[in-house]
């Protein structure tokens, strides 16, 4: 009896055959990979060999490209210079041959003023605001308006600031002991009109009230110069004043069916409310 059965021999030979086929497949794949690597390396070497040949024409065209770029930059610079020169020529032509209106030019200049002949004050206008910018703007506007009304102006003169402070509790309950401070600063300017007609001054103040600027308050003190016969002039103007006040005074008065005023007063004084006998400590003690 042999040690190895034919069945076992067939199994062993079958496994050996399987191993042989696997090794052959591995060898074939490794050979294919080597061939692809060799092909890639060959292509890379060909590309490297062809690089100097392809770069030679680019080297020859670089100076031409530089010259073209320089020409384009020169053209753009000349075009920009020409446009600047054109606009400069236009502006100089406008400044020489044309001018802006006087009202527009005055915005960029100091306000014009009239000279006072006698220097008698007629009106003191005080401007107040919490913003210096708004105050300066409206003061400049008032001075320009006075010039066109032929009113001599002096100012604006800065007056002392009004500083007000308040202290309040921050809130109730938890923050009751902590306090909060508030401060308000009022800025003032004084504009004085001299040697002006009273009607012109009234027109100036009405114009300022009509075109008042936000955040700016006004207070005016006006002086009017009258002659010695002021009583006669007041008597002459009295009927006109009565006519002007008649619609306002007609709203006040007493009813026709009401009791006379004398009777009302006597009844009130004779009432029990004012009697002294009913009051405490009114009786005199007998000695």
From Swiss-Prot:
SMART domains per the UniProt record, alphabetical: Ribosomal_S10
Which cysteine residues pair off into disulfide bonds?
Answer: none
The record places the transit peptide at: 1-33
Q: What is its main location?
A: mitochondrion
Q: Where in the cell is it found?
A: Mitochondrion
Which portions of the chain have biased composition (kind: Polar residues)?
33-43, 74-84
Q: Which GO BP terms sit in this record? A: translation
Give the residue ranges for region: Disordered.
33-84
**Would you say which domain of life the source belongs to?**
Eukaryota
Q: Which Pfam families did the record assign?
A: Ribosomal_S10 (PF00338)
Q: What does the entry list under GO cellular component? A: mitochondrion; small ribosomal subunit
Q: Where is the composition biased (Basic and acidic residues)?
A: 63-73
TM segments? none
Per UniProt, which keywords does this protein have? Mitochondrion, Ribonucleoprotein, Ribosomal protein, Transit peptide
Is Cell inner membrane a UniProt keyword of this protein? no
In the record, the note on similarity to other proteins reads: Belongs to the universal ribosomal protein uS10 family.
On assembly, the entry states: Part of the mitochondrial small ribosomal subunit.
Q: What is this protein called?
A: Small ribosomal subunit protein uS10m
Q: Which organism is it from?
A: Emericella nidulans (strain FGSC A4 / ATCC 38163 / CBS 112.46 / NRRL 194 / M139) (Aspergillus nidulans)
Q: Which classification does the entry list for the species?
A: Eukaryota, Fungi, Dikarya, Ascomycota, Pezizomycotina
